[in-house]
Protein backbone atom coordinates (compact mmCIF):
# COMPACT_ATOMS: atom_id res chain seq x y z
CA UNK A 1 0.00 0.00 0.00
CA UNK A 2 1.30 3.46 -0.93
CA UNK A 3 -0.05 6.50 0.93
CA UNK A 4 0.52 10.22 0.40
CA UNK A 5 -0.44 13.49 1.96
CA UNK A 6 -0.22 16.36 -0.51
CA UNK A 7 -0.58 19.95 0.69
CA UNK A 8 -1.18 22.51 -2.03
CA UNK A 9 -1.57 26.22 -1.38
CA UNK A 10 -3.38 28.10 -4.13
CA UNK A 11 -3.49 31.81 -4.90
CA UNK A 12 -6.24 33.51 -2.87
CA UNK A 13 -9.72 34.00 -4.24
CA UNK A 14 -10.18 31.05 -6.59
CA UNK A 15 -12.01 28.63 -4.32
CA UNK A 16 -15.03 28.05 -6.61
CA UNK A 17 -12.82 27.18 -9.60
CA UNK A 18 -10.54 25.05 -7.43
CA UNK A 19 -13.46 23.17 -5.86
CA UNK A 20 -14.94 22.30 -9.26
CA UNK A 21 -11.60 21.13 -10.64
CA UNK A 22 -10.95 19.04 -7.54
CA UNK A 23 -14.42 17.49 -7.74
CA UNK A 24 -13.70 16.37 -11.30
CA UNK A 25 -10.20 15.14 -10.41
CA UNK A 26 -11.33 13.24 -7.30
CA UNK A 27 -14.30 11.61 -9.02
CA UNK A 28 -12.14 10.33 -11.88
CA UNK A 29 -9.24 9.32 -9.62
CA UNK A 30 -11.49 7.24 -7.36
CA UNK A 31 -12.52 5.17 -10.38
CA UNK A 32 -8.95 4.18 -11.26
CA UNK A 33 -7.99 0.54 -10.74
CA UNK A 34 -5.76 0.37 -7.67
CA UNK A 35 -6.90 3.66 -6.14
CA UNK A 36 -7.88 2.86 -2.55
CA UNK A 37 -8.59 6.41 -1.38
CA UNK A 38 -8.45 9.88 -2.90
CA UNK A 39 -9.86 12.59 -0.66
CA UNK A 40 -9.22 16.32 -1.08
CA UNK A 41 -9.78 18.44 2.05
CA UNK A 42 -9.87 22.20 2.45
CA UNK A 43 -7.97 23.39 5.54
CA UNK A 44 -10.56 24.93 7.85
CA UNK A 45 -8.56 28.00 8.91
CA UNK A 46 -6.76 28.40 5.56
CA UNK A 47 -9.29 28.23 2.70
CA UNK A 48 -6.59 28.61 0.04
CA UNK A 49 -4.89 25.36 1.12
CA UNK A 50 -6.04 21.90 0.06
CA UNK A 51 -4.82 18.61 1.52
CA UNK A 52 -5.13 15.40 -0.47
CA UNK A 53 -5.06 12.04 1.26
CA UNK A 54 -4.24 9.40 -1.35
CA UNK A 55 -3.76 5.64 -1.15
CA UNK A 56 -2.86 3.24 -3.94
CA UNK A 57 -2.51 -0.54 -3.94
CA UNK A 58 0.96 -0.47 -5.49
CA UNK A 59 3.45 1.47 -7.64
CA UNK A 60 1.65 0.38 -10.81
CA UNK A 61 -1.58 2.01 -9.60
CA UNK A 62 0.27 5.20 -8.64
CA UNK A 63 1.98 5.34 -12.02
CA UNK A 64 -1.37 4.86 -13.76
CA UNK A 65 -2.77 7.76 -11.73
CA UNK A 66 0.12 10.04 -12.71
CA UNK A 67 -0.35 9.08 -16.37
CA UNK A 68 -4.13 9.49 -16.36
CA UNK A 69 -5.82 12.07 -18.55
CA UNK A 70 -7.57 13.79 -15.61
CA UNK A 71 -4.33 14.08 -13.60
CA UNK A 72 -2.45 15.59 -16.54
CA UNK A 73 -5.33 17.96 -17.34
CA UNK A 74 -5.46 19.21 -13.74
CA UNK A 75 -1.72 19.87 -13.59
CA UNK A 76 -1.57 21.54 -17.00
CA UNK A 77 -4.68 23.66 -16.44
CA UNK A 78 -4.79 27.33 -15.51
CA UNK A 79 -4.89 26.22 -11.86
CA UNK A 80 -1.29 25.04 -12.17
CA UNK A 81 -0.28 28.70 -12.41
CA UNK A 82 -2.09 29.37 -9.12
CA UNK A 83 -0.26 26.74 -7.08
CA UNK A 84 2.06 28.54 -4.68
CA UNK A 85 3.43 26.01 -2.21
CA UNK A 86 3.11 22.31 -3.08
CA UNK A 87 4.37 19.77 -0.57
CA UNK A 88 4.08 16.00 -1.08
CA UNK A 89 4.78 13.58 1.76
CA UNK A 90 4.94 9.81 1.37
CA UNK A 91 3.48 8.13 4.45
CA UNK A 92 4.56 4.90 6.15
CA UNK A 93 1.89 3.02 8.11
CA UNK A 94 2.80 2.28 11.72
CA UNK A 95 0.58 -0.79 11.98
Protein language model features and the residues they cover:
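Intrinsic disorder/low-complexity signal
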Residues: 13-18, 31, 47, 53, ...
Amino acid sequence: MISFLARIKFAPGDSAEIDESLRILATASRQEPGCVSYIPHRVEDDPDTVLFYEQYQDEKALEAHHNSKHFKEFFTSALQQKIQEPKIEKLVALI
